[in-house]
């Protein structure tokens, strides 16, 4: 076993962590689609999926089998390469962002010193998936949905980044592990409450979730930028949306709610419970809020979220300078 050097062991452990995180996040995203339908049924005083398996427990398996056997159709006048590339980017962009999230003190795939910047870069990469899907489909509804999505995502990514600068200033680092360790005694949600509110709103918008789902509004755009997709390509878009929810929920926990910190229970359990809570909040928001007009969404971002993030950053900088004196 002389070939098993310490460097090789580190590489193998990193690969193992990446595979485990990949399987867990994809599984959580898939099961969230089933849980969302059950919870929406509960909120709306009706039954959710309850036909396949005991209490609908095998509905997810039935959906996966149906997705595998559906025709993988590509429109005749579409750009085939870009049309195929778009769902792959949508699936992998926010999945890669989860690599920087520390699940426990010893379990993180990539402990980057520029962790937050890496997340913002991956969130920006997701815009290309939407643009590619809308433009390559050669469909007017798809293109309109892509234009809406790109404008909305680029706008709310400004607030997404600015809302994190207060957290970075307090921790003195872009490293996610350092930010969690800085919350050992006080969670960032207390001194950075406005930053948390803005980040949560922008996170919902970046995931294109209700009430910020105008890019795929069924009543207006007939499902928006992925109207021409079917089979596994549509499945990648579908699961990618829920992976985005898992990633944003995990980032909210890591940046504002102490990450794995908590009494009595093991660190991983605390992280999982907090993340599951915010995943349920995504579902509750969908069940309870109406969909505003597109102009109202953009106006809310630039007239409410942007001033709020700037005020939060200004107050944070003033407090840090006052404490340094």
Curated annotation (Swiss-Prot):
Entry function: NDH-1 shuttles electrons from NADH, via FMN and iron-sulfur (Fe-S) centers, to quinones in the respiratory chain. The immediate electron acceptor for the enzyme in this species is believed to be ubiquinone. Couples the redox reaction to proton translocation (for every two electrons transferred, four hydrogen ions are translocated across the cytoplasmic membrane), and thus conserves the redox energy in a proton gradient. This subunit may bind ubiquinone.
Gene Ontology CC: plasma membrane
Subunit structure: NDH-1 is composed of 13 different subunits. Subunits NuoA, H, J, K, L, M, N constitute the membrane sector of the complex.
Name by which UniProt lists this protein: NADH-quinone oxidoreductase subunit H
GO-annotated molecular function: NADH dehydrogenase activity; oxidoreductase activity, acting on NAD(P)H, quinone or similar compound as acceptor; quinone binding
Membrane topology recorded in Swiss-Prot or TrEMBL: Multi-pass membrane protein
Keywords per UniProt: Cell inner membrane, Cell membrane, Membrane, NAD, Quinone, Translocase, Transmembrane, Transmembrane helix, Ubiquinone
Family to which this protein belongs: Belongs to the complex I subunit 1 family.
Annotated compartments: Cell inner membrane
The UniProt record lists the keyword Mitochondrion: no
Chief place of localization: membrane
Any one GO biological process: aerobic respiration
Record keyword Metal-binding present: no
Enzyme class at the top of the EC tree: translocase
EC number(s) from the headed UniProt entry: 7.1.1.-
Spans through the membrane: 11-31, 81-101, 114-134, 154-174, 186-206, 237-257, 265-285, 304-324
Reactions catalysed according to its record: a quinone + NADH + 5 H(+)(in) = a quinol + NAD(+) + 4 H(+)(out)
